[in-house]
């Protein structure tokens, strides 16, 4: 387990290259698919269930790539990118705890969208609480999460599942 409880954008980029937690740790996506600019807080015993929590942010500006293509004349951040960020953070949490292998999203129990991220927004905040951690042959994290834009909750997800696999050939 890492002793760090916050991470910069540079740290997150290093995670995508296998240089933060080690070469065999789960990696974050690189470049445009990395939907996180910083992790403000991560711990292994906090949150609603006492199994861990993560708070992270993404800075929003009108120049972000997705505003140009989603949609013409009606720019909005795709909801799937916010959901993917939540999965990214569950995988990051498992790597932070020392899991080794490749992270894969395994599903989500429920997702609700009650708002949107427009180019005028300034900041997205992700808040995850870990519900369950499995460290057996299968390593898996299950979390509940919310996403806020400029302090207003607009997405919620229950039972986000991420698995860490040492072999993905049969996945």
Curated annotation (Swiss-Prot):
It comes from the Bacteria. Pfam families: FabA. InterPro entries: FabA, FabA_FabZ, HotDog_dom_sf. The active site is at residue 70. GO terms for molecular function: (3R)-hydroxyacyl-[acyl-carrier-protein] dehydratase activity; trans-2-decenoyl-acyl-carrier-protein isomerase activity. It catalyses: a (3R)-hydroxyacyl-[ACP] = a (2E)-enoyl-[ACP] + H2O; (3R)-hydroxydecanoyl-[ACP] = (2E)-decenoyl-[ACP] + H2O; (2E)-decenoyl-[ACP] = (3Z)-decenoyl-[ACP]. Its EC number is 4.2.1.59, 5.3.3.14. It is found in: Cytoplasm. The keyword Amino-acid biosynthesis does not apply. One of its GO terms (cellular component) is cytoplasm. Transmembrane segments: none annotated. Keywords: Cytoplasm, Fatty acid biosynthesis, Fatty acid metabolism, Isomerase, Lipid biosynthesis, Lipid metabolism, Lyase. The keyword Lipid metabolism applies. CDD domains: FabA. GO terms for biological process: unsaturated fatty acid biosynthetic process. Pathway: Lipid metabolism; fatty acid biosynthesis. Homodimer. Necessary for the introduction of cis unsaturation into fatty acids. Catalyzes the dehydration of (3R)-3-hydroxydecanoyl-ACP to E-(2)-decenoyl-ACP and then its isomerization to Z-(3)-decenoyl-ACP. Can catalyze the dehydratase reaction for beta-hydroxyacyl-ACPs with saturated chain lengths up to 16:0, being most active on intermediate chain length. Belongs to the thioester dehydratase family. FabA subfamily. PANTHER family: 3-HYDROXYACYL-[ACYL-CARRIER-PROTEIN] DEHYDRATASE, 3-HYDROXYDECANOYL-[ACYL-CARRIER-PROTEIN] DEHYDRATASE. This is 3-hydroxydecanoyl-[acyl-carrier-protein] dehydratase. It comes from Shewanella halifaxensis (strain HAW-EB4). The gene is fabA.
